[in-house]
Amino acid sequence: MRCPYCGGLDTQVKDSRPSEDASAIRRRRICPDCGGRFTTFERVQLRELTVVKRSGRKVPFDRDKLQRSIDVALRKRSVESDRIERLVSGITRQLESSGEPEVTSEAIGELVMEGLKGLDDVAYVRFASVYKNFREAKDFEELLGRLSADQQDGAVPQAEADRPIGAGPPSEAAQPAAGEGGDAPMRRARSRA
């Protein structure tokens, strides 16, 4: 692995361990030439995906770009990094296991919106405003109206935020008990932490 600091080719692995969700191997490396330390991640890649942009242009799928987009939407929000990683990994797994070699940027955007909607309302609105190219205040009003209606209908239980995209229906244990609000599982999870 090339050193990102000096370009040296002979870096050494000092520590290897699985990531928290076991979807990657985290390796701490050191460069004997400059002494630089850095971290790399090794992940399974099921297939090469191509993203078809709105313009028709085709580019390779970039997991890091997906991560950055989600990070921008979640900037200054109190969402744990492992939940963000589960969201990114879940979207990536769903795309790779779809069986299709090409995926539209619109499909990726919809998956991100679905994931953010269950994770953080503010991040969902931020992402949607850019993704849907909002031009006027009424665009925000319509989205917020739908979001409020969905929450009143219980369409997006907060407990689903911990479930990766594409993981199937939530178990009964993840559903709020009778009389509990949709955020009760989150309160229980925080009290355990």
From Swiss-Prot:
Pfam families: ATP-cone, Zn_ribbon_NrdR
GO MF: ATP binding; DNA binding; zinc ion binding
Entry keyword Iron: no
Start and end residues of each ATP-cone domain: 49-139
The organism's place on the tree of life at top rank: Bacteria
Keywords: ATP-binding, DNA-binding, Metal-binding, Nucleotide-binding, Repressor, Transcription, Transcription regulation, Zinc, Zinc-finger
Zinc finger (unnamed) stretch: 3-34
One GO term of the biological process aspect: negative regulation of DNA-templated transcription
Similarity comment: family membership: Belongs to the NrdR family.
The protein, known as: Transcriptional repressor NrdR
